[in-house]
Structure formats: structure tokens, C-alpha cells
Amino acid sequence: MKQIQVDLGVRSYPIYIGQNLMSDGETLSRYLLKKRILIVTNETVAPLYLKQIQETMASFGEVESVILPDGEQFKDLAHLDTIFTALLQQNYGRDSVLVALGGGVIGDMTGFAAACYQRGIDFIQIPTTLLSQVDSSVGGKTAVNHPLGKNMIGAFYQPQIVLIDTLCLHTLPAREFAAGMAEVIKYGIMWDADFFQWLEDNVTALKTLDAQALVYAISRCCEIKADVVSQDETEQGVRALLNLGHTFGHAIEAEMGYGNWLHGEAVSAGTVLAAQTAKALGLIDESIVCRIIQLLQAFDLPVRAPESMDFDSFIQHMRRDKKVLGGQIRLVLPTAIGRADVFSQVTESTLEQVIRCA
């Protein structure tokens, strides 16, 4: 079992990565003893893992569950209220703990519920998708979507522990695994050139779910994110680099309807647009754009935005992006493989040229 620490002073917490960790009561015991436990999961994950995790936790306290519909389109205030209603109807107090058992949607909603309920109760992340294991479960970003924008209603709120059981990936649909790889590849582009090269060399091992390759890839992503979050918890500086591909990607998700494009698929196409924007600005050359496209394609990810989206549909969503300052769209762009920066002086005419030519 691999352990990584997210260093945030009194809010520090461990990430555990390994096989069969959902049956590891010893690791969970210190976070659950004598507490009331409410597991939040969805209709897809519940038949696979809910009974297993309930049995693991049963010796620590009273365990109940809330099962939500599965999909990004249900990450909203109405379904957040379902969690609050369960907590209130069953008289959960401040000594309770919420457990997020699922992917990024479940993790984001459960964390936000924990941040809000009685002004804050403990929560635990048990991510079951690759995307949530390498990205959304770590760092304390919690939120729900609004029809006018993704993740616009939320809070920074850290979990007590992140428990990553790599065996969950064996029940993950291939499309969901590919979507997670978009976030994995992002880390190589924006932070670690050696890791990007390793990904290029290990496509087959990852696609066949080789145990060692999975643990290394997930661990490296979590190490990078833990490092970044420890430096900049609330995204005032370097943490913004983790949004590579996301400004374009969130626009795709919002325009196409949440759930029609998976988050990772939108990030993949958005990452290519970011790379093409960087090339248009003279920050990188065509060879880097090609390497990025080839690696994304190797994992069966989309590298073009939907044909139905034009510049106007992109720009209306990008103007609502959370990174906008003083009315200026701020983009995370690669400056090399392994490096990125935030740029606020990208003109709309440049963006229009890139989007029209993509």
C-alpha cells in the first residue's frame, strides 16, 4: 500500500493507494470509531461496492446510505438536498461522518454537503473511477453545477482521508477509464515531462490494467496534486495550472448538456485547444501539439470539440469561467511538455482563430 500526505497543517490528511483497501478496516478505524456513518453513493456503484464497504464499517458505528442517480446531470442543488434531507430526517449530528463512495460527482456533492451541514462535518473520499482517484478526490474542491455553469456553487473543504482501491478500476467501463486518462495525461503536460514520457511508453500496460502501472500512475498524479495543493490550497496561484484544458472543457460540457460528454472527454478536447492556442501564440511548436494529440488518441479520447460548437458558443461559457478576473479570460497553456502557465492576455480574435481552425 502506497501512502501520500497532503500537507495542509491542521487540515493535512493521507491518501492510501493499493488493492482491496475497501476491506481494510484497520486503515479506516481511526476516522470512524464511535461515529454515525452515512455513505453517499449512486445507482451504478451501490450494487458493486456498497455492501462490501458497509460490512467493513459496521464494527465502527451505525452505517446508513443514500443512493443517488448516476450522472453529471444529477450534480445539482436538488440532489444535494437529498443528502441534507437524509441527514436531518435521521438526526445526524456534528460527530457524524459522510463517506463519498463513487466517482467525481459523488465526491464533489458529498464533500459540499459535509462542508455545509451544521457548518461542517467530517467526510471520507473512497473514489471508484480513475478520474476521481487521480484528481477530484484530492484537494478539497467540492461543488454542484448550475444550469449556467459547472461547479459554480461550492466550497474548499478537505476530507479526513482518501482511500483509493485500484481493484475498482476492473469494473469501470472502458469509456470512463479513458476519461480518467485525460486527467492523468494533464499532469504530465503541465508538471512532469518524465511522467509524460512514461505514459507514452506504457499505454498498453495501463489499458490492460496492469497492477503496477496503475499504482504508479495514480500515485504520481496524487503526488503532483498533493504538492500543488500544499502550496496553494484555494487556487490563488500555482493550483490554477491543474485547470489545463478545463476552460475549454467546461464550455463543452455546459454547451452539450452535462453528462453527454464525460468530463474527461471534454478536458481531452479542451487540452488540445489549449495546446493549439499555445502554438498560435508561439509558446510551443507543432511537435508538442502532435505528441499531446497522439497520447490522447492512444487512450481513445476525443481530440476535437463537437462540430456543433462554434466560437460564439465557446466564448459565452468561457466568460463565466471561475478564473476570469477583471473581465479577462485567463487560460492555462502549456509552454513545454512538463510546464504550463496562466495567460490573461489572450485576445478573443486569437481564440476565434484557434476554434475555427480546430
Curated annotation (Swiss-Prot):
Alphabetical UniProt keywords: Amino-acid biosynthesis, Aromatic amino acid biosynthesis, Cobalt, Cytoplasm, Lyase, Metal-binding, NAD, Nucleotide-binding, Zinc
Positions bound to NAD(+): 70-75, 104-108, 128-129, 141, 150, 168-171
Cofactor: binding comment: Binds 1 divalent metal cation per subunit. Can use either Co(2+) or Zn(2+).
CDD domains: DHQS (cd08195)
Pfam families for the chain: DHQ_synthase, DHQS_C
Record: residues binding Zn(2+): 183, 246, 263
Subcellular location: Cytoplasm
Cofactor: Co(2+); Zn(2+); NAD(+)
Pathway named in the protein's UniProt entry: Metabolic intermediate biosynthesis; chorismate biosynthesis; chorismate from D-erythrose 4-phosphate and phosphoenolpyruvate: step 2/7
EC number: 4.2.3.4
Gene Ontology BP annotations: amino acid biosynthetic process; aromatic amino acid family biosynthetic process; chorismate biosynthetic process
Cellular component GO terms, alphabetical: cytoplasm
GO molecular function term, any single one: 3-dehydroquinate synthase activity
Entry coiled-coil feature ranges: none
Claim: Amino-acid biosynthesis is one of the keywords in the record: yes
Signal peptide per UniProt: none
Listed InterPro entries: Dehydroquinate_synthase, DHQ_synth_AroB, DHQ_synth_fam, DHQS/DOIS_N, DHQS_C
Reactions listed under catalytic activity: 7-phospho-2-dehydro-3-deoxy-D-arabino-heptonate = 3-dehydroquinate + phosphate
UniProt xrefs under HAMAP family: DHQ_synthase
Protein family: Belongs to the sugar phosphate cyclases superfamily. Dehydroquinate synthase family.
Protein name: 3-dehydroquinate synthase
Gene source species: Shewanella baltica (strain OS155 / ATCC BAA-1091)
